[in-house]
Amino acid sequence: MAPSNLPPVFNATSQDMEMLLAAQCHLGSKNLQVHMDPYLWKTRPDGINVINIGKTWEKIVLAARIIAAIDNPADICVISARPYGQRAVLKFAAHTGAVAIAGRFTPGSFTNYITRSFKEPRLIIVTDPRTDAQAIKEASYVNIPVIALCDTDSPTEYVDVAIPTNNKGRHAIGLVWWLLAREVLRLRGTLATRETEWDVVVDLYFYRDPEAEEAKELEEAKAAGVDEIGPGAVESGFGAEGWEASAGTAFGAAAATTTTTNPATATATWEATGGDWASSAPAEGWAGEAPATEAKW
């Protein structure tokens, strides 16, 4: 790591550097844009370009100082069309007061005042210049400064401040947004001193797969159900005596109801039907033919 050009108060701690390395913020892609060459440390034998995380930290501090210089936090727009960065921008907006656009960027949001999503921010921050190209293009039309998380292969056209980092890994994206939010709060004075620990853990900025979370909740619910039943219930037969008693009572009540109600209902019904058949003309004809049939048999 090259020596830092920042004042001592802005220098990164060893813990910050360890977090950047653990999140693989230093691992770029195999391609290299010419404008990202100053941020390159070396190229590994397998072709992966390694980013100088000292430069990454310097750009995080520079971006935080730009953000803190804007009086109204609502004039800052944070954008991420990449799924891995959507949770991070929403959390960043919640903690700093910025406006978040997570998901698809509606074309014309910065240039077409007729649209409902029209905005006039003083600064935009994007997760990936390639996936958020529409937002950067419109910002260039209306002279909005752009801060972007740039990988080694990211286009830097119309990007004013490039933060060199891995912008494809969910941990790298979440960590950079978390560090940026923390530095902004420190510069605003929300965190009393630089030694004060931020009580928001970095895990909140990481992307979470909805399907994986759902499956995890189902497994936890199943495990909780097994624990509630327990081995004691299995050995005792799940309260078989109670089931027999309740079943016997239920069937006994049903039988009693049938015995008391059915005969009366049946008698009344058959009497009415018998009277109808007796009074009808065809019934007499059948009664006359019956003895002849008995004689034949």
Swiss-Prot record:
Pfam families: 40S_SA_C, Ribosomal_S2
Primary location recorded for the protein, binned into one broad class: cytoplasm
MF terms (GO), sorted A to Z: structural constituent of ribosome
Biological processes per GO annotation: ribosomal small subunit assembly; translation
Subcellular location: Cytoplasm
Chain positions covered by the region annotation Disordered: 276-297
Keyword RNA-binding: no
Superkingdom classification of source: Eukaryota
GO terms under cellular component: cytosolic small ribosomal subunit
InterPro entries on file: Ribosomal_uS2, Ribosomal_uS2_C, Ribosomal_uS2_CS, Ribosomal_uS2_euk, Ribosomal_uS2_euk/arc, Ribosomal_uS2_flav_dom_sf
Keywords, ordered alphabetically: Cytoplasm, Ribonucleoprotein, Ribosomal protein
Record bears the keyword Hydrolase: no
Sequence similarity: Belongs to the universal ribosomal protein uS2 family.
Biological function: Required for the assembly and/or stability of the 40S ribosomal subunit. Required for the processing of the 20S rRNA-precursor to mature 18S rRNA in a late step of the maturation of 40S ribosomal subunits.
Subunit structure: Component of the small ribosomal subunit. Mature ribosomes consist of a small (40S) and a large (60S) subunit. The 40S subunit contains about 33 different proteins and 1 molecule of RNA (18S). The 60S subunit contains about 49 different proteins and 3 molecules of RNA (25S, 5.8S and 5S). Interacts with RPS21.
Cited NCBIfam families: uS2_euk_arch
HAMAP family: Ribosomal_S2_euk
Name of the protein in question: Small ribosomal subunit protein uS2
UniProt organism field: Uncinocarpus reesii (strain UAMH 1704)
Gene that specifies this protein: RPS0
